[in-house]
Amino acid sequence: MLPTVFIVSDGTGITAETFAHSILSQFDQKFRLVRVPFIDSIEKAYGTVQKIDDAAQHDGRRPIVFTTLVDGESNEIVKRSNALVLDMFQRFVEPLEQELQLKSSHAMGRVHQNADTEEYKTRIEAINFSLAHDDGQSNRNLADADVILIGVSRSGKTPTSLYLAMQYGVKAANYPLIPEDFERGKLPTPLHPHRDKLFGLSIDPMRLSEIRNERRPGSKYAAPENCRYEINEAEAMMRREGVKWLSSTHKSIEEIATTILQEIKLERQSY
């Protein structure tokens, strides 16, 4: 039976879950994840304890609990559960209070209270921009892009563009490199004025073939030899044109996005 891990938060739980994934990925073990967001009352805290204790009894072992509860009373209630409770708020905030000689606000969900802020507006604009400029469907306003991702079809351009927009407010367009471009030996014409904004994504040809076969099984588009040809030509073109690029094969979207931000010297706040 897989160990049970609870993600307990008074907000969405995104912060706690991100931290939990980072820690748990260090262990060669699968886990059963249980998300318990919006614990913003004493009653909900007691209800959470019941869920945790029930899991302990069912599993025959203590669950692991990652918590970012700000309210002290709710936090103490959860800590009384039959579990290993890892309190990220107390672990980091209290030493900072001592070091800075300041009291934190202890405001629940403060990191996500951005619905009326300029940052929120920036993020929405970036998402709309990325959707409008997905897969080269529009050449309008490409000059407004923070970055333009290029690569062969199914190399990870679309999810990376949307992640950059949603997480960092980056206006990320993406443009496909197709066989006609390789025959001409040149970048697509609409990209010529924006070479300084280009960043390429490549991928292992066999992995690309697997992905394409899910979409169009048995087609030339998905054939291993065609995928090898397209990847070789795309990488050669990017080297020739001086475009920075990376392979997305063994990287998460988070890793790809962080690398892109570093390479193109973009400084953005994570939302």
From Swiss-Prot:
Known HAMAP family for this protein? Answer: PSRP
- InterPro entries per record: Kinase-pyrophosphorylase, PSRP
Q: What EC number is given for this enzyme?
A: 2.7.11.33, 2.7.4.28
NCBIfam families given in the database record: PRK05339.1 (NF003742)
* Keyword line: Kinase, Nucleotide-binding, Serine/threonine-protein kinase, Transferase
| GO MF entries | ADP binding; ATP binding; phosphotransferase activity, phosphate group as acceptor; protein serine/threonine kinase activity
Sequence intervals crossing the membrane? none
Supply the enzyme class, top level.
transferase
So what does this one do? Bifunctional serine/threonine kinase and phosphorylase involved in the regulation of the phosphoenolpyruvate synthase (PEPS) by catalyzing its phosphorylation/dephosphorylation.
Protein name listed in UniProt:
Putative phosphoenolpyruvate synthase regulatory protein
Q: What is the lineage of its organism?
A: Bacteria, Pseudomonadati, Pseudomonadota, Betaproteobacteria, Burkholderiales
Q: Where does ADP bind?
A: 151-158
Give the catalysed reaction(s), semicolon-separated. Answer: [pyruvate, water dikinase] + ADP = [pyruvate, water dikinase]-phosphate + AMP + H(+); [pyruvate, water dikinase]-phosphate + phosphate + H(+) = [pyruvate, water dikinase] + diphosphate
Question: Its family?
Answer: Belongs to the pyruvate, phosphate/water dikinase regulatory protein family. PSRP subfamily.
Which cysteines bridge via disulfide bonds? none
